[in-house]
Amino acid sequence: MTKIASILFILLLAVPAFSEEASCLHHTEHQKKVNERGDRVMGFDHEKTIHHFELKPDGGVIRAEAIDRNDVNSIESIRHHFVEISGLFSKGDFSMPAMIHDRIPPGVGVMKTLKDEITFTHHEIEKGSEVRIKTANPDALKAIHDFLRFQIEDHGTGDSPTISSLILR
């Protein structure tokens, strides 16, 4: 009986490890698919670019940059995409993130409803672009933060899911 109990105990300890490993493999595969769809929808290669998402007290920032400052094709593709999404987001159209992530990201419903209380401003930066998102509406702000936290997690950027106290632009 003790031998059986010992074996059962060892198996019980092993189950969470197998479960965690399976979860990691699933997440890695999911991020690979997100990047593949992103390359297609956004028009630039995620292997040649860096994506960042920042939460700000009044909204947030979506930023993409070419890794190589001489990669003019990636820089121009990023800029084209960011001009496009700032215009679409301003109209309440979040179909691109839905296509990339294969689901509607959290916060999108509220951001669509409150689109007139949110600004999406495109800025070119040295190696790419950013979209600055701002609002004074507390419900819109929560939705923006939910949206950006989802982006951080689903893209696996490693960006902080906490609000940065620095307000730029």
Report the location of each language-model feature:
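N-terminal signal peptide c-region/cleavage motif recognized by signal peptidases
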Residues: 14-16
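Sec-dependent signal peptide recognition
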Residues: 2-10
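Intrinsically disordered, low-complexity terminal tails/loops enriched in metal-binding residues
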Residues: 19-169
